[in-house]
Regions:
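Non-catalytic N-terminal regions of enzymes
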Residues: 1-135
Length: 135
């Protein structure tokens, strides 16, 4: 990457359109077989998952970068390395409310996606959802 890794024009427009009550970001929901991610109590192996994600971040260095605004906003923001990067801020567990059906998962996804990502850190999150019916 170049010395100045500038945000694209499209991403910058999303950034400026965003409001606290209306975040403008992309999200996805994927359902996987839970057993490999769970310990004997049925809880997510977060430390192991965080270690696996962290070990692969060198392939996607932007996931360790946060935005920095240009003085007076005279140009698009740039991506800068986050010296305070903590994988625990990005990979978390959350339990879907009972009964753990598709509707509850949809509501949880809506709630998580409606929250703004903190701009002081890299702009991504990974939520491991437990409590789905059939887990």
């Amino acid at each position: 990457m170049s010395a100045l890794d500038r945000l694209t024009t499209l991403d910058t427009s999303f950034l400026w359109l965003e409001r606290p009550d209306a975040p403008v970001h992309v999200g996805a929901v994927a359902v996987f077989e839970g057993a490999p991610l769970l310990d004997e109590r049925g809880e997510p192996r977060l430390d192991e998952l965080r270690a696996r994600v962290l070990a692969r971040l060198d392939r996607l260095p932007r996931l360790r970068r946060r935005l920095a605004r240009v003085p007076l906003d005279l140009d698009r923001p740039v991506w800068v390395d986050d010296p305070d990067f903590d994988i625990a801020d990005h990979v978390r567990a959350v339990r879907v409310p009972a009964p753990g059906d598709d509707e509850q998962l949809r509501r949880l996804a809506e709630r998580l996606h409606s929250e703004s990502l903190p701009r002081a850190r890299p702009l991504w999150d990974l939520h491991v959802v437990t409590g789905l019916a059939g887990d």
